[in-house]
Swiss-Prot record:
Keywords for the protein's UniProt record, in alphabetical order: Cytoplasm, Ribosome biogenesis
InterPro entries: Ribosome_maturation_RimP, RimP_C, RimP_C_sf, RimP_N, RimP_N_sf
Pfam families, per database record: DUF150_C, RimP_N
Stretch forming the signal peptide: none
Source organism of this protein record: Mesorhizobium japonicum (strain LMG 29417 / CECT 9101 / MAFF 303099)
Source organism, top-level taxon: Bacteria
The protein, known as: Ribosome maturation factor RimP
Span list, region Disordered: 180-215
């Protein structure tokens, strides 16, 4: 992943190479149907697999949403044809132990444990594990999980130095993620004027649809 800019992309962690080209194709499609891109990744496992990770603006993503995104982006990919070989299209939600790709993600998940890799050396390291203590406008403050002898207990990492950050699965994260998801779903139902039925406890907005597409 890289921080190469693209028009209309508010992510601080972005793709490079063929992944970046695919992201440019699918992002306008996603915005047009009310979704935002989290990540694009083309891998060579089991043939070629194109993973598109997306979510709604409120952070939710259902199985039906995955199917809608798959139906919407497939024609755009057929027209631009960025992948020369046959591949499987896999659309999924970010999941609970999600990657953090926007400044707003760091704000939303402040207080939770993350693993972070940087593109340059920061405080004599390129890998960090700790809690997000503060998410500012230009950087994020990480409270180290286990500071080595002589290291400061916290480190401030500029956003433009971050190569990848993922949440680490913990009991606190699961509880918080489910609470945020249930609240977002209820608010969405209220906006649509639908009955405010309770979302079953433990339900996750994590679903994947696989679609095979010939180049």
């Amino acid at each position: 992943m890289t921080a190469t800019a693209s028009e209309g992309d508010d992510r601080i962690i972005r793709e490079s190479g063929i992944d970046a080209r695919i992201a440019l194709i699918v992002q306008p499609v996603l915005r047009g149907i009310g979704f935002r891109l989290v990540r694009v990744h083309l891998s060579g496992q089991n043939g070629l697999t194109l993973q598109i990770m997306a979510e709604r603006e409120d952070g939710t993503m259902t199985v039906e949403d995955c199917e809608e995104v798959s139906r919407a982006v497939s024609p755009a990919l057929d027209v631009d044809d960025p992948i020369e070989k046959a591949y499987h299209l896999e659309v999924s939600s970010p999941g609970i132990d999600r990657p953090l790709v926007r400044k707003s993600d760091f704000v939303t998940w402040t207080g939770h444990l993350v693993k972070m890799e940087t593109s340059v050396i920061v405080a004599d390291r390129k890998r960090f594990k700790g809690k997000i203590a503060e998410a500012g406008e230009n950087d994020v403050l990480i409270e180290r999980d286990k500071a080595a002898y002589g290291e400061e207990p916290t480190v401030r990492v500029p956003y433009d130095a971050i190569a990848e950050t993922r949440l680490i699965l913990t009991d606190d994260l699961i509880r918080d993620a489910l609470s945020k998801d249930n609240r977002a779903r209820k608010e969405a139902k209220k906006r649509r004027g639908e009955p405010d039925d309770d979302v079953p406890e433990g339900a996750e907005a994590d679903a994947t649809e696989e679609h095979e597409q010939e180049s």
